[in-house]
């Protein structure tokens, strides 16, 4: 599967039922095989409803901005725009991922990765306009991207908890892909604690880099090392790691697909 060709991940990246018995035998070695099997079934079932794509056309970007307006302006009380779109100056240097519903292609989730701009103060990352942090002393800003506008609308979310989790994981998969493509080694963010907790449940752990700040609610400036996060995820949440990295193919300094297959688990994506 490749963003370079189709710019989407429909059939070839979806979790489908082509997982053989060897997958389950491999996961019997996990510390909690029952939970592992439940996670696998959840991903298989929920991924039949959604797919992720890069927002690489004006039309898809407008859909992302429209969803952001629904989430941040209508639902969370940001200033409402007459255009019905929520966008800002950071979008000019931020690739986006959207998650779409398969049966009608409606955009139900989006996230952007604000890329560093060496010629701008603070490398052009929004975190520096919102708070004082020691981010620049912790990581190399030239390879740090800011995770921002992580949005799934309540209005469009008449979803099971499993589907909601898949939406988040599909967005994280997009972040991993974009980070690999743009040489990003660290993510920073200014997030609500509730979102940080949800990410932590999938072994995505951010560390604070400053005190809580008020920005349309209290938020925590945070940072993480992408490689470290994925290494921890591979140990603690192997099935989720396989989904988020496409069996290790999206982040090459981890376990390779070939090694993964020798354990008896093949990435569960239709070719």
What are these regions (language model features)?
Residues 4, 9-58:
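Conserved N-terminal entry element of GNAT/NAT acetyltransferase domains
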Residues 33-40, 134-145, 230-233:
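Acyltransferase donor/substrate-recognition loop-hinge adjacent to the catalytic core
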Residues 38-86, 91-103:
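Short amphipathic alpha-helix that is part of the acyltransferase structural core
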Residues 98, 105-115:
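Conserved beta-strand in the GNAT
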Residues 109, 125, 255-258:
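Structured alpha-helical
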Residues 121-226:
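Acyl-donor binding region in acyl/amide transferases
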Residues 210-262:
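Accessory, usually C-terminal, subdomains that scaffold auxiliary metal cofactors
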